[in-house]
């Protein structure tokens, strides 16, 4: 799947003038499994072997990553049985590290915005905390927003999420304005 995401970015790069895009201002955003994929997109490079398919003369690197409720370290245990099964069946023991964005972080990665609910029972918010710590350790610009009282879908089953969805949207817009200017 990451191969398809990387090919999509290369396609945007190759067709930027046709789509009226600035190829130097392409970012990626994903939620849950999409958060995992954009995190892997932001941390992987051509040496990982995932740049296959069309537009190989183009870069699959993005300039900013927004990952919401992402899985970042598959070596950790998950309370959700489906994620645990996917780790072993979908990736296999040998590929767990390779499929973990946290293992690919280098100092030349794009800026990251990580957003995670503190009541997420599907993907523990520690996944974003660990990724944030690794990014900071490697001097990658990173921002972590833990949404209080929010579950995996950023809703608040018991009260109000803080920051609110409107505030989260503004945080995202500010991040994009800063890094995709």
What spans do the regions from the language model cover?
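Primarily recognizes the serine-hydrolase "nucleophile elbow" in alpha/beta-hydrolase
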Residues: 7-80, 96
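Extracytoplasmic/secreted proteins, especially bacterial periplasmic and envelope-associated proteins
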Residues: 4-7, 11, 36, 40, ...
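C-terminal catalytic histidine-bearing segment of alpha/beta-hydrolase fold enzymes
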Residues: 129-181
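Short beta-strand/loop motif that positions the catalytic acidic residue
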Residues: 108, 113-116, 120
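Acidic catalytic loop of the alpha/beta-hydrolase fold
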Residues: 73-74, 119-123
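Serine-hydrolase-like catalytic core of hydrolytic proteins
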Residues: 1-25, 131-141, 147
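Mobile cap/lid helix-loop segments that gate and shape the active-site cleft of serine hydrolases
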Residues: 70-104, 110, 137
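Loop/turn elements at helix/coil->beta-strand transitions in domains of secreted/extracellular proteins
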Residues: 23-25, 61-64, 109-112, 138-143
């Amino acid at each position: 799947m990451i191969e398809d995401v990387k090919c999509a970015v290369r396609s945007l790069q190759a067709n930027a003038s046709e789509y009226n895009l600035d190829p130097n201002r392409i970012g990626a955003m994903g939620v849950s499994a999409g958060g995992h994929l954009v995190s892997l997109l932001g941390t992987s490079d051509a040496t990982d072997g995932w740049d296959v398919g069309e537009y190989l003369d183009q870069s699959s690197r993005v300039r900013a990553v927004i990952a919401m409720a992402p899985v970042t370290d598959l070596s950790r245990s998950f309370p959700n049985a489906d994620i645990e099964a996917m780790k072993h069946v979908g990736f296999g023991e040998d590929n767990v590290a390779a499929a973990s964005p946290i293992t690919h972080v280098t100092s030349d990665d794009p800026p990251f915005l990580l957003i995670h609910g503190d009541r997420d029972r599907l993907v523990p918010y520690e996944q974003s905390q660990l990724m944030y710590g690794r990014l900071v350790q490697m001097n990658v610009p990173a921002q972590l927003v833990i949404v209080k009282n929010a579950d995996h879908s950023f809703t608040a089953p018991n009260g109000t999420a803080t920051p609110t969805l409107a505030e989260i949207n503004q945080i995202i817009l500010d991040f994009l304005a800063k890094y995709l200017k």
